[in-house]
Amino acid sequence: MRPGSTPASRRKSRPPRRVSPPLPTTSTRSPGRPSAPEQRKAPRATPKKRFRPGTRALMEIRKYQKSTELLIRKAPFSRLVREVCMTYACGLNYSWQSMALMALQEASEAFLVRLFEDSYLCSLHAKRVTLYVQDIQLARRIRGVTEGLG
């Protein structure tokens, strides 16, 4: 073995790529000139960039922190609101304006974002990075009845 070439530091070899045999082609060149064997090269697929674990998650966090659009899709949220309204309105079917649904969705997403921020602070206080259910429960308990939804 060469110096500095340990089994862990050597590059792994890739298996040889199979190359399909060249396709028979008819040449449109003049018959007096011999044509070189034409080889078609397959388009080389560029390998996807590999990120270290956690980098992609941080990129996603930064992307969503910069954006201002709603993160919950409108149709499922609308169905959920109508279902909850049917439950509490004794079977009456209310009609909703689209602006009212958007305002409710905006408020609910702001509430969830703030709850997750507080919950993550609770997990950091416990010297953890992973968010647990108990962190969310603690954040809601600290907020109280009015801010933590009961």
Swiss-Prot record:
Residues 25-37 have a biased composition (Low complexity). Pfam families: Histone (PF00125). Residues 42-53 have a biased composition (Basic residues). Keywords: Centromere, Chromosome, DNA-binding, Nucleosome core, Nucleus. GO terms for cellular component: chromosome, centromeric region; nucleosome; nucleus. Residues 1-56 are annotated as: Disordered. Residues 53-150 are annotated as: H3-like. It comes from the Eukaryota. It is found in: Nucleus; Chromosome, Centromere. SUPFAM superfamilies: Histone-fold. GO terms for molecular function: DNA binding; protein heterodimerization activity; structural constituent of chromatin. Belongs to the histone H3 family. Component of centromeric nucleosomes, where DNA is wrapped around a histone octamer core. The octamer contains two molecules each of H2A, H2B, CENPA and H4 assembled in one CENPA-H4 heterotetramer and two H2A-H2B heterodimers. CENPA modulates the DNA-binding characteristics of nucleosomes so that protruding DNA ends have higher flexibility than in nucleosomes containing conventional histone H3. Histone H3-like nucleosomal protein that is specifically found in centromeric nucleosomes. Replaces conventional H3 in the nucleosome core of centromeric chromatin that serves as an assembly site for the inner kinetochore. The presence of CENPA subtly modifies the nucleosome structure and the way DNA is wrapped around the nucleosome and gives rise to protruding DNA ends that are less well-ordered and rigid compared to nucleosomes containing histone H3. May serve as an epigenetic mark that propagates centromere identity through replication and cell division. This is Histone H3-like centromeric protein A. The lineage of its organism: Eukaryota, Metazoa, Chordata, Craniata, Vertebrata.
